């Protein structure tokens, strides 16, 4: 059974791709940001840092895991994502990938607060590596965007769908 959200996303994505756009529509960034209460500019900066905005990017890691798509979702998330009806092939769909990346970031924010440490945790577990990663992301933010500011208090723990 296909979920209505997924069907609507597929229709929007096919319309978007039919017009030859290289990147997901702004609505994908905004929808994910609103759903998971994170900044759309921050999501975009993470995607720029992770994949150079390439929705087909695949990164191979020294530990044997892979990073998939626009937001470079690590393959270690695949078992968890499968319980939400998302498989590896789905992660090459830019809007799905953005939503999953936003969900991961929101989990970090829930644990660490809306901080650069939470941004760094998107990519690294060690504090020094988190800081270095957050600095890379910060450089990809538009100049008018300040450091993460705390959004309204979270009231739900949404899934990546």
Which residues make up each language-model segment?
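N-terminal secretory signal peptides that target proteins for export/translocation
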Residues: 1-6
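Bacterial N-terminal signal peptides
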Residues: 10-21
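Catalytic glycan-binding domains that act on GlcNAc-containing polysaccharides
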Residues: 26-161
